[in-house]
């Protein structure tokens, strides 16, 4: 179960990183 929790938390982390990168890309365009 801890593995599944880690995976979901990690995917949330990646989503937040992707969102930040997207915002940076928009501001730089």
Curated annotation (Swiss-Prot):
UniProt-listed InterPro entries: Glucagon (IPR015550), Glucagon_GIP_secretin_VIP (IPR000532)
Induction: Produced in the A cells of the islets of Langerhans in response to a drop in blood sugar concentration.
Keyword Phosphoprotein in record: yes
Pfam families, per the entry: Hormone_2
Biological processes annotated in GO: adenylate cyclase-modulating G protein-coupled receptor signaling pathway; negative regulation of apoptotic process; positive regulation of insulin secretion involved in cellular response to glucose stimulus; protein kinase A signaling
Keywords: Hormone, Phosphoprotein, Secreted
Main location: secreted
Localization: Secreted
Residue list for modification Phosphoserine: 2
A GO molecular-function annotation: glucagon receptor binding
PROSITE patterns the record matches: GLUCAGON
GO cellular component, one term: extracellular space
UniProt similarity note: Belongs to the glucagon family.
Role this protein plays: Glucagon plays a key role in glucose metabolism and homeostasis. Regulates blood glucose by increasing gluconeogenesis and decreasing glycolysis.
Protein name: Glucagon
Organism: Oryctolagus cuniculus (Rabbit)
């Amino acid at each position: 179960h801890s593995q599944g929790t880690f995976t979901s938390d990690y995917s949330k982390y990646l989503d937040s990183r992707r969102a930040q990168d997207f915002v940076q890309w928009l501001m730089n365009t």
